[in-house]
C-alpha cells in the first residue's frame, strides 16, 4: 500500500490513533466532516449510516436529524461512549467507503492527534513526581486530605458522599431545595455541595476531580442556561462522563428544573433526565431522583 493510499483499515491505520479520544479533533476538522457527511445523497454514505455503525439506535438518529448540524451533534454524543476514538472513526469511514473524506482529512486529523499528544506530554511533564504505589480510595496528599468540612486533615478517613452536585451559583436556590428533599427527609442522602462542603483555599479543578472520582458515587448535573456558560460545570460534566464511558455505570444524572432558552447540551442528550418542569411527573420527581442516587 502506497503512502498516499487513502484507504484506511484496522491493519493499516496507525495504532496509536485508537488510543486518541475524539476530543483531539479540532473545530476545523469537525466542520469539514460536517460538509462531507451532512448532505443526504444516494451515491455516498452520510452521517446517518455512520451513526448506525457507531451503535446509535433509530430514535436517537431521528432526534439528531432535528439538529442544525447533525454530524457535529453526532460526534459530540459519540465521544462520551465506550470505544469512541479517532482511530475508530477513521475505521468506520473506511468501512463506509468514504475514501474522499480520508484522502482530504487524514493528514489534518493526524496533525490534530500529534498536537493532542504533545499537549498531554507537556501536562505530564509538569506534574510533580509521585510515589509509584498509591491507594486510589484514600487521598495521599495534604492538599486533598482536608478539602471538605468533615474531612480528616491527615487524609486517613476522607468524607464520602452519595452524589456530587454540579451547579451554577444562580441555581443555588434549587440546590437548597435538593438538600431539603434528599438530606433532611427519610432518604437521608449525603450530597456534596461545593459552597457548603468544600473548604476554601485550594485549586477548584483538583478538588472537583478528587470529589467526583473518589468521594462521590454519582454526580447530579443541574442544567440551566447559566450552566451552559460555566467552564467549571463543563469540566466537571466531561470529567464525570470520562469515568463512565457510554454511561454504563449510571454515574451521571442530569436535572432540568426550569425552562431553558438555549438548547439542552448535546453531550447529555442521550442520558435519561429528571425533568422538574413537567407537571405530569413532578410529583414523582424526588422519589425517582432519590432511588437513582441510592443504587449501589
From Swiss-Prot:
One of its GO terms (biological process) is toll-like receptor 8 signaling pathway. Induction: By interleukin-6. InterPro entries: DEATH-like_dom_sf, Death_dom, MyD88_Death, Myelin_different_resp_MyD88, TIR_dom, Toll_tir_struct_dom_sf. SUPFAM superfamilies: DEATH domain, Toll/Interleukin receptor TIR domain. Adapter protein involved in the Toll-like receptor and IL-1 receptor signaling pathway in the innate immune response. Acts via IRAK1, IRAK2, IRF7 and TRAF6, leading to NF-kappa-B activation, cytokine secretion and the inflammatory response. Increases IL-8 transcription. Involved in IL-18-mediated signaling pathway. Activates IRF1 resulting in its rapid migration into the nucleus to mediate an efficient induction of IFN-beta, NOS2/INOS, and IL12A genes. Homodimer. Also forms heterodimers with TIRAP. Binds to TLR2, TLR4, IRAK1, IRAK2 and IRAK4 via their respective TIR domains. Interacts with IL18R1. Interacts with BMX, IL1RL1, IKBKE and IRF7. Interacts with LRRFIP1 and LRRFIP2; this interaction positively regulates Toll-like receptor (TLR) signaling in response to agonist. Interacts with FLII. LRRFIP1 and LRRFIP2 compete with FLII for MYD88-binding. Interacts with IRF1. Upon IL1B treatment, forms a complex with PELI1, IRAK1, IRAK4 and TRAF6; this complex recruits MAP3K7/TAK1, TAB1 and TAB2 to mediate NF-kappa-B activation. This is Myeloid differentiation primary response protein MyD88. It comes from Mus musculus (Mouse). The gene is Myd88.
Amino acid at each position: 500500500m502506497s503512502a498516499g493510499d487513502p484507504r484506511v483499515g484496522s491493519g493499516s491505520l496507525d495504532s496509536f490513533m485508537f488510543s486518541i479520544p475524539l476530543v483531539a479533533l479540532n473545530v476545523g476538522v469537525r466542520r469539514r466532516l460536517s460538509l462531507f457527511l451532512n448532505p443526504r445523497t444516494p451515491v455516498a454514505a452520510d452521517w446517518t449510516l455512520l451513526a448506525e455503525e457507531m451503535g446509535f439506535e433509530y430514535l436517537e438518529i431521528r432526534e439528531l436529524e432535528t439538529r442544525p448540524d447533525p454530524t457535529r451533534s453526532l460526534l459530540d454524543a459519540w465521544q462520551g461512549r465506550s470505544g469512541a476514538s479517532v482511530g475508530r472513526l477513521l475505521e468506520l469511514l473506511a468501512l463506509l467507503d468514504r475514501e474522499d473524506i480520508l484522502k482530504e482529512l487524514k493528514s489534518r486529523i493526524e496533525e490534530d492527534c500529534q498536537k493532542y499528544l504533545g499537549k498531554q506530554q507537556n501536562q505530564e511533564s509538569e506534574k510533580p513526581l509521585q510515589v509509584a504505589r498509591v491507594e486510589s480510595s484514600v487521598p495521599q496528599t495534604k492538599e486533598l486530605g482536608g478539602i471538605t468540612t468533615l474531612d480528616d486533615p491527615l487524609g486517613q478517613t476522607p468524607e464520602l458522599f452519595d452524589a456530587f452536585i454540579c451547579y451554577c451559583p444562580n441555581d443555588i436556590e434549587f440546590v437548597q431545595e435538593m438538600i431539603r428533599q434528599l438530606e433532611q427527609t427519610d432518604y437521608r442522602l449525603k450530597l456534596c455541595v461545593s459552597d457548603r462542603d468544600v473548604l476554601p483555599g485550594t485549586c477548584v479543578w483538583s478538588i472537583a476531580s478528587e470529589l467526583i472520582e473518589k468521594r462521590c458515587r454519582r454526580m447530579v448535573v443541574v442544567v440551566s442556561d447559566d450552566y451552559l456558560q460555566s467552564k467549571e460545570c463543563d469540566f466537571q460534566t466531561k470529567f464525570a462522563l470520562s469515568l463512565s464511558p457510554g454511561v454504563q455505570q449510571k454515574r451521571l444524572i442530569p436535572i432540568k428544573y426550569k425552562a431553558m432558552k438555549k438548547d439542552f447540551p448535546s453531550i447529555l442528550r442521550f442520558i435519561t433526565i429528571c425533568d422538574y418542569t413537567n407537571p405530569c411527573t413532578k410529583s414523582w420527581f424526588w422519589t425517582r431522583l432519590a432511588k437513582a442516587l441510592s443504587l449501589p
